[in-house]
Protein backbone atom coordinates (compact mmCIF):
# COMPACT_ATOMS: atom_id res chain seq x y z
CA UNK A 1 0.00 0.00 0.00
CA UNK A 2 1.59 3.22 -1.17
CA UNK A 3 0.36 6.53 0.21
CA UNK A 4 0.31 9.43 -2.22
CA UNK A 5 1.77 12.76 -1.17
CA UNK A 6 -1.77 14.11 -0.75
CA UNK A 7 -2.66 11.16 1.49
CA UNK A 8 0.51 11.63 3.53
CA UNK A 9 -0.49 15.24 4.01
CA UNK A 10 -4.00 14.19 5.00
CA UNK A 11 -2.61 11.79 7.63
CA UNK A 12 -0.29 14.41 9.10
CA UNK A 13 -3.13 16.97 9.10
CA UNK A 14 -5.54 14.49 10.68
CA UNK A 15 -2.99 13.62 13.32
CA UNK A 16 -2.73 17.27 14.29
CA UNK A 17 -6.43 17.29 15.19
CA UNK A 18 -6.32 14.28 17.51
CA UNK A 19 -5.54 14.08 21.19
CA UNK A 20 -3.73 10.84 22.11
CA UNK A 21 -5.13 11.09 25.64
CA UNK A 22 -8.65 11.01 24.23
CA UNK A 23 -8.60 8.98 21.01
CA UNK A 24 -6.39 6.12 22.23
CA UNK A 25 -8.49 5.16 25.25
CA UNK A 26 -11.68 5.50 23.19
CA UNK A 27 -10.38 3.28 20.40
CA UNK A 28 -9.09 0.54 22.70
CA UNK A 29 -12.27 0.60 24.79
CA UNK A 30 -14.33 0.32 21.59
CA UNK A 31 -12.24 -2.70 20.52
CA UNK A 32 -12.81 -4.46 23.85
CA UNK A 33 -16.55 -3.71 23.86
CA UNK A 34 -17.37 -4.42 20.20
CA UNK A 35 -15.07 -7.46 19.93
CA UNK A 36 -15.20 -8.95 23.44
CA UNK A 37 -13.00 -11.94 22.54
CA UNK A 38 -10.08 -9.50 22.35
CA UNK A 39 -10.35 -9.07 26.12
CA UNK A 40 -8.38 -12.29 26.61
CA UNK A 41 -5.17 -10.38 25.87
CA UNK A 42 -5.87 -7.90 28.65
CA UNK A 43 -6.57 -10.16 31.64
CA UNK A 44 -4.08 -8.17 33.74
CA UNK A 45 -6.20 -5.02 33.32
CA UNK A 46 -8.63 -6.02 36.08
CA UNK A 47 -12.35 -5.45 35.64
CA UNK A 48 -13.28 -5.35 31.96
CA UNK A 49 -16.54 -7.26 32.41
CA UNK A 50 -18.87 -4.58 31.04
CA UNK A 51 -18.82 -1.55 28.78
CA UNK A 52 -18.95 0.76 31.80
CA UNK A 53 -16.07 -1.09 33.48
CA UNK A 54 -13.98 -0.91 30.31
CA UNK A 55 -14.69 2.80 29.77
CA UNK A 56 -13.69 3.56 33.37
CA UNK A 57 -10.66 1.28 33.53
CA UNK A 58 -7.42 3.28 33.94
CA UNK A 59 -5.30 0.44 32.50
CA UNK A 60 -7.39 0.43 29.32
CA UNK A 61 -6.96 4.20 29.07
CA UNK A 62 -3.21 3.98 29.67
CA UNK A 63 -2.71 1.26 27.08
CA UNK A 64 -4.86 3.18 24.60
CA UNK A 65 -2.39 6.05 24.95
CA UNK A 66 0.48 3.61 24.32
CA UNK A 67 -1.25 2.41 21.14
CA UNK A 68 -1.63 5.96 19.86
CA UNK A 69 2.00 6.62 20.77
CA UNK A 70 2.96 3.72 18.52
CA UNK A 71 0.77 5.11 15.74
CA UNK A 72 2.47 8.47 16.21
CA UNK A 73 5.80 6.79 15.41
CA UNK A 74 4.30 5.52 12.15
CA UNK A 75 3.01 9.00 11.28
CA UNK A 76 6.52 10.34 11.83
CA UNK A 77 8.00 7.52 9.70
CA UNK A 78 5.56 7.25 6.81
CA UNK A 79 8.37 6.10 4.51
CA UNK A 80 9.34 3.17 6.74
CA UNK A 81 6.34 1.91 8.68
CA UNK A 82 7.44 -1.74 8.41
CA UNK A 83 10.86 -0.92 9.84
CA UNK A 84 9.31 1.23 12.55
CA UNK A 85 7.18 -1.71 13.72
CA UNK A 86 9.67 -4.57 13.31
CA UNK A 87 10.37 -4.96 17.04
CA UNK A 88 6.73 -4.42 18.03
CA UNK A 89 5.64 -7.07 15.53
CA UNK A 90 8.09 -9.55 17.04
CA UNK A 91 6.83 -8.85 20.57
CA UNK A 92 3.17 -9.30 19.58
CA UNK A 93 3.97 -12.46 17.62
CA UNK A 94 6.52 -14.29 19.75
CA UNK A 95 5.91 -13.04 23.29
CA UNK A 96 2.25 -11.99 23.47
CA UNK A 97 0.91 -14.41 20.81
CA UNK A 98 -1.71 -11.91 19.65
CA UNK A 99 -3.90 -13.07 16.77
CA UNK A 100 -2.85 -10.69 13.97
CA UNK A 101 -6.48 -10.17 12.90
CA UNK A 102 -6.90 -8.16 16.09
CA UNK A 103 -4.72 -5.43 14.58
CA UNK A 104 -7.32 -5.00 11.84
CA UNK A 105 -10.10 -4.87 14.42
CA UNK A 106 -8.23 -2.21 16.36
CA UNK A 107 -7.73 -0.24 13.14
CA UNK A 108 -11.50 -0.37 12.57
CA UNK A 109 -12.16 0.76 16.14
CA UNK A 110 -9.64 3.57 15.75
CA UNK A 111 -11.27 4.70 12.49
CA UNK A 112 -14.72 4.84 14.08
CA UNK A 113 -13.36 6.76 17.07
CA UNK A 114 -11.66 9.28 14.77
CA UNK A 115 -14.80 9.69 12.67
CA UNK A 116 -16.91 10.29 15.77
CA UNK A 117 -14.42 12.83 17.10
CA UNK A 118 -14.03 14.83 13.88
CA UNK A 119 -17.53 14.50 12.44
CA UNK A 120 -18.46 14.62 8.75
CA UNK A 121 -16.70 17.90 7.99
CA UNK A 122 -13.41 16.83 9.58
CA UNK A 123 -13.52 13.23 8.43
CA UNK A 124 -14.55 13.26 4.79
CA UNK A 125 -14.21 10.41 2.30
CA UNK A 126 -10.72 11.48 1.20
CA UNK A 127 -9.48 11.56 4.78
CA UNK A 128 -11.07 8.20 5.47
CA UNK A 129 -9.38 6.73 2.39
CA UNK A 130 -5.98 8.06 3.48
CA UNK A 131 -6.48 6.75 7.02
CA UNK A 132 -7.60 3.35 5.72
CA UNK A 133 -4.47 3.03 3.58
CA UNK A 134 -2.24 4.20 6.44
CA UNK A 135 -3.80 1.77 8.92
CA UNK A 136 -3.60 -1.07 6.37
CA UNK A 137 0.14 -0.44 6.19
CA UNK A 138 0.36 -0.42 10.00
CA UNK A 139 -1.63 -3.66 10.26
CA UNK A 140 0.60 -5.27 7.63
CA UNK A 141 3.73 -4.14 9.47
CA UNK A 142 2.48 -5.46 12.80
CA UNK A 143 1.65 -8.80 11.19
CA UNK A 144 4.98 -9.10 9.39
CA UNK A 145 6.56 -11.48 11.95
CA UNK A 146 3.62 -13.86 11.62
CA UNK A 147 4.50 -14.73 8.01
From Swiss-Prot:
Taxonomy, superkingdom: Eukaryota
PROSITE patterns: GLOBIN
Record's keyword terms, sorted: Heme, Iron, Metal-binding, Oxygen transport, Transport
Entry binding sites for heme b: 63, 92
GO molecular function: haptoglobin binding; heme binding; metal ion binding; organic acid binding; oxygen binding; oxygen carrier activity; peroxidase activity
Tissue expression pattern: Red blood cells.
Gene Ontology cellular component annotations, sorted alphabetically: blood microparticle; haptoglobin-hemoglobin complex; hemoglobin complex
Domain Globin span(s) in chain numbering: 2-147
GO terms for biological process, alphabetical: hydrogen peroxide catabolic process
Description of how the protein assembles with itself and partners: Heterotetramer of two alpha chains and two beta chains.
Chain's role: Involved in oxygen transport from gills to the various peripheral tissues.
Similarity section: Belongs to the globin family.
Protein name as catalogued: Hemoglobin subunit beta
Amino acid sequence: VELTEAQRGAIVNLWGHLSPDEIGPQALARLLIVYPWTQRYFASFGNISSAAAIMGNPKVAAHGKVVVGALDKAVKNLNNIKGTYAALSTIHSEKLHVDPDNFRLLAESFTVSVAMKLGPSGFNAETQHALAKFLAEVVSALGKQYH
